[in-house]
């Protein structure tokens, strides 16, 4: 994967997250902001999830209250380089915990 392909894939990921949060109809207030390639999700209780891209490594990084995760693209899924879990699984687990209700991005 070259840098432009990586950025295209990361942009698609960011757009999907933003669209899902725009459609969010849960009880919690969840905000999403993109600034300089960093996507910040802020929850009603003040907690945050930070997602950023690491261009030199062609990785997506996810920072949550539970910890930090690094994802490599394998096939068509972003996979955690430590646990083997998918990006969407870990994001949904963290968002659900931080929102206090079920949050789905798929």
From Swiss-Prot:
It comes from the Bacteria. GO terms for biological process: iron-sulfur cluster assembly. GO terms for molecular function: ferric iron binding; ferrous iron binding. InterPro entries: CyaY, Frataxin/CyaY, Frataxin/CyaY_sf, Frataxin_CS. GO terms for cellular component: cytosol. Gene3D superfamilies: Frataxin/CyaY. Keywords: Iron, Metal-binding. Pfam families: Frataxin_Cyay. Belongs to the frataxin family. HAMAP family: CyaY. NCBIfam families: FeS_CyaY (TIGR03421). Involved in iron-sulfur (Fe-S) cluster assembly. May act as a regulator of Fe-S biogenesis. This is Iron-sulfur cluster assembly protein CyaY. It comes from Escherichia fergusonii (strain ATCC 35469 / DSM 13698 / CCUG 18766 / IAM 14443 / JCM 21226 / LMG 7866 / NBRC 102419 / NCTC 12128 / CDC 0568-73). The lineage of its organism: Bacteria, Pseudomonadati, Pseudomonadota, Gammaproteobacteria, Enterobacterales.
